[in-house]
């Protein structure tokens, strides 16, 4: 019987169903599963204790057959498995052209991503209502009518247009990633590629790695305001540091992945 080789992109109930069907028909399966974030924490944030247990079942069954490819070793229960580590990137030459000078008169904050509990967006919205500084927050994701009414907060529909995404970074001066759990978020590389500093909270401090231009804040309004103030005051110096980053390209990432799964 032929061995069915597969590459699974993340562990989800839907992917597990396809996985189970393949096992039923092919019996012998091997390959890889890419883990971009800590599913245990994500399912726990969304569904509580039972969410973690459901994910644990899927995790153990899939990793019996597939070898994990991870973007960070900060994944729960990973120590029990042999794994490969890669650094994903979507950065092309387009990201490194026509830089725009930021407006620093006030904090123009940006978040790009899903509007979900585990992404920390609701937490961020609560924090900024206590701000004493002038700010504007742009959220690019699923647009929801009457989601949050505030003159300083604007919602935009998600987009796959690189040109539009770049314009969002260029029209703001700080990117905030408020997630409770992350692996290797591509938005960090995008923001740094456009010379825009990034703020994350202490729960995902590991994403900083050796990258310059990433700042870690406690999850409270006072510390976040202090971090924003420091960035705006030292913006030119921070941009000079960001330029020293060696950001992996999408081409390099794709070549590394192809070599790994061959």
Region annotations inferred by a language model:
Residues 146-160:
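Nucleotide-activated donor-binding/catalytic signature segment of Leloir-type glycosyltransferases, i.e.
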Residues 42, 53-97:
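A short, active-site helix/loop in glycosyltransferases that binds the activated sugar's phosphate group
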Residues 167-172:
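Short alpha-helical donor nucleotide-sugar binding micro-motif in glycosyltransferases
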Residues 236-262:
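A charged, aromatic-enriched C-terminal amphipathic alpha-helix characteristic of glycosyltransferases
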Residues 202, 213-222, 230-235:
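Conserved acidic donor-binding segment of nucleotide-sugar-dependent glycosyltransferases
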Residues 180:
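Aromatic "clamp/platform" in nucleotide-sugar-dependent glycosyltransferases that forms part
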Residues 107, 111-130, 139:
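A conserved mid-protein helix/loop that constitutes part of the nucleotide-sugar donor-binding site
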Residues 188, 197-200:
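Short hydrophobic beta-strand element within catalytic cores of glycosyltransferases
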């Amino acid at each position: 019987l032929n061995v069915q080789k597969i590459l699974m992109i993340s562990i989800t109930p839907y992917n597990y169903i396809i996985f189970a069907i393949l096992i039923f028909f092919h019996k012998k399966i091997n390959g890889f599963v890419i883990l971009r974030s800590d599913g245990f924490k994500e399912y726990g944030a969304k569904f509580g204790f039972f969410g973690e247990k459901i994910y644990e079942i899927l995790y153990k069954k899939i990793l019996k057959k597939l070898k994990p490819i991870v973007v960070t070793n900060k994944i729960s229960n990973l120590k029990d498995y042999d794994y490969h580590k890669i650094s994903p990137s979507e950065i092309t030459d387009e990201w490194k052209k026509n830089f725009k000078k930021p407006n620093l008169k006030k904090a123009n904050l940006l978040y790009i991503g899903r509007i979900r509990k585990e992404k920390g967006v609701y937490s961020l919205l609560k924090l900024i209502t206590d701000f004493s500084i002038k700010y504007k927050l742009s959220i690019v994701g699923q647009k929801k009518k009457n989601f949050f009414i505030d003159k300083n907060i604007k919602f935009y529909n998600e987009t796959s247009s690189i040109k539009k995404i770049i314009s969002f970074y260029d029209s703001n001066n700080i990117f905030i990633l408020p997630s409770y759990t992350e692996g290797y978020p591509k938005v960090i590389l995008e923001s740094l590629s456009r010379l825009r500093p990034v703020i994350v909270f202490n729960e995902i401090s590991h994403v900083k790695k050796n990258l310059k231009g990433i700042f870690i804040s406690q999850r409270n309004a006072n510390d976040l305001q202090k971090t924003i103030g420091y960035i705006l005051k030292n913006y030119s110096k921070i941009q000079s540091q960001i330029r020293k980053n060696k950001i992996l390209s999408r081409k390099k990432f794709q070549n590394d992945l192809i070599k790994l799964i061959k």
